């Protein structure tokens, strides 16, 4: 049975709050250099995404609560042209994140060529909201949603040469400077 949820993303300078049916699902917060802190509020998981490598890079996901490795995402050499990221989840389970259009407004997760999660952003409203459909709500669904949003945001920033959300990021810095 397919389940549908609405989602919304709010952000300030490199910090994103992801709401699922208006309930805070989690946060994505840019750390130092090539790290992101991902907190899944619903389950209390605290994760660290670390990008290592230059040409053949990978994103390693570590659970900060237990210290164990959750998985690894292989980044294509030319991610601008190739819209698939392979995710090897703990236990050797393989999944693929697929961007369905150039800027990744529509993306999905596949396991064994079956779609387990699909997201479509409503670009008409322009408020970073949309619909997420799940084939079934699994234990790792929250992780897949936040990881997918992370990959989508990463791709949008790379493809727009850093201009994606630039006005919002600059407005946030001006607001901080006015208070000082």
Each model region followed by its residue ranges:
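Short, conserved, surface-exposed binding loops centered on an aromatic residue
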Residues: 61-62, 77-79, 87
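Acidic (Asp/Glu) and glycine-rich low-complexity loops/linkers
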Residues: 75-76, 148
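Short, solvent-exposed loop/turn segments at conserved positions within beta-propeller repeat blades
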Residues: 9, 52-55, 79-80
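Beta-strand C-termini and the immediately following turn/loop, strongest in propeller blades
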Residues: 51, 74, 97-99
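Short, well-structured hydrophobic secondary-structure segments
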Residues: 38-69
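Low-complexity or membrane-interfacial segments used for flexible interactions
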Residues: 1-35, 44-45, 68, 81-86, ...
